[in-house]
Amino acid sequence: MRLTPHEQDRLLISYAAELARRRRARGLRLNHPEAVAVITDHLLEGARDGRTVAELMVSGRSVLTRDDVMDGVPEMLHDVQVEATFPDGTKLVTVHQPIA
């Protein structure tokens, strides 16, 4: 199977998010890269499901809470941006202050 660099990036994000979700299910708090992966995967899958940019910008802020991540992660994570593929094309989705 041959994947483009873009497809490889998406696959890596998906796997990193899945690993982070398993760790969270075991009661571990997520570090910065794990938190970014989970939020990014949520945005990419939401776009694939046909949700709008506005919906994803709102829902992206409720994926993780301060209790889900290690100390200091919310302060380090100001924005999460990803170019997601929607039914009508690719759009940039930005979630400001994604961890409340």
From Swiss-Prot:
NCBIfam families: PRK13241.1, urease_gam. Heterotrimer of UreA (gamma), UreB (beta) and UreC (alpha) subunits. Three heterotrimers associate to form the active enzyme. It is found in: Cytoplasm. One of its GO terms (cellular component) is cytoplasm. PANTHER family: UREASE. Gene3D superfamilies: Urease, gamma-like subunit. Belongs to the urease gamma subunit family. It catalyses: urea + 2 H2O + H(+) = hydrogencarbonate + 2 NH4(+). This is Urease subunit gamma. Its EC number is 3.5.1.5. Keywords: Cytoplasm, Hydrolase. GO terms for molecular function: nickel cation binding; urease activity. Pfam families: Urease_gamma. Pathway: Nitrogen metabolism; urea degradation; CO(2) and NH(3) from urea (urease route): step 1/1. GO terms for biological process: urea catabolic process. HAMAP family: Urease_gamma.
